[in-house]
């Protein structure tokens, strides 16, 4: 999974560098009456060149140290090494939902849950990809009964469709034991959804907030049953440390932070900042959800986690060409990357010692690690919940519940 943070050494001041580039090329942007069009063309060309230069520098300063760091971590082990998928308990009778379950970590999460007996709703936008994933799962795991794998249509970028997915699920099952908020988009250009939300924040955070909110009655009803073990697991990333330093989640505009000045919204720097901010939101969401569940005495566990630096096509796409081989040489495969999710969702010790684990951030199976200081800010967590609720209610989608 993309990290968005230099692994070592002094930080590269991208924002000041970007500003200096803008000032430098501003010399070309004040046209005279005689030759305004050529200078305007030159200014646009110079701006694109400057953005590209910053992107190359950003990739060099970020991904090479990242590869070295991950190699060291791979040699020393990820997590504390005493838990693996062989310790997943029997899950017969349980029902799970995994968003983005058709590929990557989500695919292997679905596989392991179903292999242990759970009925799994594979939540994904594309019907063809979801059904192809289910077909492949059954071919690779013939012992999984067909009825254990069900496609749940879900487009996290659309509030109306998220609510539809929740209603669809609640019409099909009377319990929900495990909700894995796994789906997400990698660093992305600055575009808006039909609801008016910035795409990265919409998919990675807002859509999952709405899905969880809509499913809370079902989760609580399951948690009220004797012997239940209900968990909500939200995938974040070490990239959360690359969040926007100026975003404190105090206004609705903070959900639409471009993380760059005009003309720079699609630079790798801005894309990375938006991604990091959305991953910060994942941790704050999980923390605040736990606080609210404790306040209500609901008995639901909420955890967030960093699955590690995972080898995916998306991870390669966000890197400069020169550093893309690092993905295939040093990153963890998605099957192994699902171990942290499975620990959080199923490990017996998490329920048996719930006070130790609930609301925490995991950095490997069985490994609690403090996230960034802002991700531990309880006030920011409450603020984020409140502005997200206001933004979602403003779309009118919740009226369909």
Curated annotation (Swiss-Prot):
Annotated TM spans: 51-71
Applications: Diterpenoid pyrones display various biological activities and higginsianin A shows anti-HIV activity.
Keyword Signal appears in the UniProt entry: no
GO molecular function annotation: oxidoreductase activity
GO CC annotations, alphabetized: membrane
Source organism, top-level taxon: Eukaryota
Binding site for NAD(+): 72-80, 99-100, 118-120, 275-279, 308-310
Membrane topology of the entry: Single-pass membrane protein
InterPro entries: NAD(P)-bd_dom_sf (IPR036291), SDR_fam (IPR002347)
Pfam families registered for this protein in UniProt: adh_short
Enzyme class: oxidoreductase
Gene3D superfamilies per the UniProt record, alphabetical: NAD(P)-binding Rossmann-like Domain (3.40.50.720)
Active site: 275
SUPFAM superfamilies recorded: NAD(P)-binding Rossmann-fold domains
One of the GO biological process terms: terpenoid biosynthetic process
Role summary: Short chain dehydrogenase/reductase; part of the gene cluster that mediates the biosynthesis of the diterpenoid pyrones higginsianins A and B. The first step of the pathway is the synthesis of the alpha-pyrone moiety by the polyketide synthase dpchA via condensation of one acetyl-CoA starter unit with 3 malonyl-CoA units and 2 methylations. The alpha-pyrone is then combined with geranylgeranyl pyrophosphate (GGPP) formed by the GGPP synthase dpchD through the action of the prenyltransferase dpchC to yield a linear alpha-pyrone diterpenoid.
PANTHER family given in the database record: PHOSPHATIDYLINOSITOL-GLYCAN BIOSYNTHESIS CLASS F PROTEIN (PTHR43157:SF31), PHOSPHATIDYLINOSITOL-GLYCAN BIOSYNTHESIS CLASS F PROTEIN-RELATED (PTHR43157)
Name of the protein in its database record: Short chain dehydrogenase/reductase dpchH
Organism in which the protein naturally occurs: Colletotrichum higginsianum (strain IMI 349063) (Crucifer anthracnose fungus)
């Amino acid at each position: 999974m993309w990290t968005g943070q230099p692994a070592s050494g002094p930080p590269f001041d991208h924002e000041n560098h970007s500003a200096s580039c803008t000032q430098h090329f501003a010399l070309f942007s004040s046209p005279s009456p005689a030759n305004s069009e050529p200078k305007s063309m030159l200014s646009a060309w110079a701006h694109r060149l400057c953005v590209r230069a910053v992107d190359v520098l950003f990739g060099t300063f970020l991904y090479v140290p990242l590869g070295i760091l991950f190699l060291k971590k791979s040699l020393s082990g990820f997590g504390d090494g005493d838990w693996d998928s062989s310790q997943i308990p029997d899950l017969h009778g349980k029902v799970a939902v995994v968003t983005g379950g058709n590929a990557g970590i989500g695919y292997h999460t679905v596989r392991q849950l179903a292999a242990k007996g759970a009925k799994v709703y594979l939540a994904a936008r594309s019907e063809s990809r979801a059904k192809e994933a289910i077909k492949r799962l059954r071919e690779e795991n013939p012992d999984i009964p067909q009825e254990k794998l069900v496609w749940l249509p879900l487009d996290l970028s659309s509030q109306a469709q998220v609510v539809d997915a929740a209603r669809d699920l609640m019409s099909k099952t009377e319990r929900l034991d495990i909700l894995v908020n796994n789906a997400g988009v990698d660093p992305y250009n600055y575009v808006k959804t039909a609801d008016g939300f910035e795409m990265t924040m919409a998919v990675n955070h807002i859509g999952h907030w709405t899905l969880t909110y809509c499913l809370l009655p079902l989760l609580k009803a399951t948690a009220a049953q004797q012997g239940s073990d209900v968990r909500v697991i939200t995938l974040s990333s070490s990239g959360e440390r690359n969040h926007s330093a100026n975003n404190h989640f105090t206004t609705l505009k903070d959900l639409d932070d471009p993380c760059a000045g005009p003309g720079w919204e699609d630079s790798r720097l801005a894309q990375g900042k938006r991604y990091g901010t959305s991953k910060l939101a994942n941790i704050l969401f999980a923390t605040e959800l736990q606080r609210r569940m404790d306040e209500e005495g609901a008995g639901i566990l909420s955890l967030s986690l960093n699955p590690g630096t995972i080898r995916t096509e998306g991870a390669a796409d966000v890197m400069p060409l020169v550093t893309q081989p690092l993905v295939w040489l040093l990153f963890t495969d998605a099957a192994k990357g699902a171990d942290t999710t499975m620990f959080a969702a199923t490990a017996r010790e998490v329920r048996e010692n719930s006070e130790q684990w609930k609301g925490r951030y995991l950095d490997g199976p069985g490994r609690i690690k403090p996230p960034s200081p802002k991700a531990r800010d309880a006030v920011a967590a409450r603020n984020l919940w409140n502005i997200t609720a206001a933004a979602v209610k403003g779309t009118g989608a919740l009226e369909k519940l």
